[in-house]
């Protein structure tokens, strides 16, 4: 019964009001909450794209070992992304406060987007059935997406 409930929940969350993005398609514009320079801010995709390509990397949870390492890797390569005129944004379901703490502690030079309502997670189809210590749950699949300056999804890494 528990597996059936999880499967049903997965089908419901996997059926967003809009189709998940695929490489070669134009990304839907969105505005959402984010943390920049230690303060709550907003992020708008079309506005960001005026400055060049955008990398959105989705990660499960702030301040966990794997997510910290991933964020540190993006931080350490930040100058290379800047040289390529590409902006980096991390996305998780964590709160703005959790993002503020995580960003400050790790000295991330990029914004962290709070997707507590899973709007972006559904758009990019990153909510997946996962297992941890034998328990099944719905969580974010670690994924990265490159959107060119025209708003077209060029590449995805999962």
Task: Locate the predicted segments by residue.
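Positively charged n-region of N-terminal signal peptides that target proteins for export
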Residues: 1-4
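Short, linear, compositionally biased motifs with a strong N-terminal bias
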Residues: 10-11
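Chalcogenol-based redox active-site neighborhoods
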Residues: 18-158
